[in-house]
């Protein structure tokens, strides 16, 4: 069975020591969804929201969140990210927004949490900007799509 890396022999949480690991190129992609009424989504698509461009704001929020993941999640390392990309896609056929994030660096630890945080905070930002119009939006699912680099190897979700 695989061991939990953030738990020591005494069962205590600790930050993993990555100092002996080799620097490798690491990348992770994650996605999140925000379901909403067709009228709320139309307001976003048409750009008629009184707070401004919802997608631009969510994109910037996701990028900022990826860079601050280590401040939000206690055992994450501060990372020198070399790429953070957040793409937002309106999906009117499903009354939702799909968010996909991608994070990359050359370093000793992976960027899965940064990608997940970027997608999550972008979704939360959409909710925040639109809650005056609709409070029952649904955020989720949020998941890791893929990761590459590092000792544990590559991962890609099955389509």
Swiss-Prot record:
Its EC number is 4.6.1.17. This is Cyclic pyranopterin monophosphate synthase. The gene is moaC. One of its GO terms (biological process) is Mo-molybdopterin cofactor biosynthetic process. GO terms for molecular function: cyclic pyranopterin monophosphate synthase activity. Homohexamer; trimer of dimers. InterPro entries: MoaC (IPR023045), MoaC_bact/euk (IPR047594), MoaC_sf (IPR036522), MoCo_biosynth_MoaA/MoaC (IPR050105), Mopterin_CF_biosynth-C_dom (IPR002820). Pathway: Cofactor biosynthesis; molybdopterin biosynthesis. Belongs to the MoaC family. It comes from Yersinia enterocolitica serotype O:8 / biotype 1B (strain NCTC 13174 / 8081). The active site is at 128. Catalyzes the conversion of (8S)-3',8-cyclo-7,8-dihydroguanosine 5'-triphosphate to cyclic pyranopterin monophosphate (cPMP). It is an enzyme of class 4 (lyase). Keywords: Lyase, Molybdenum cofactor biosynthesis. Substrate binds at residues 75-77, 113-114. It catalyses: (8S)-3',8-cyclo-7,8-dihydroguanosine 5'-triphosphate = cyclic pyranopterin phosphate + diphosphate. CDD domains: MoaC_PE.
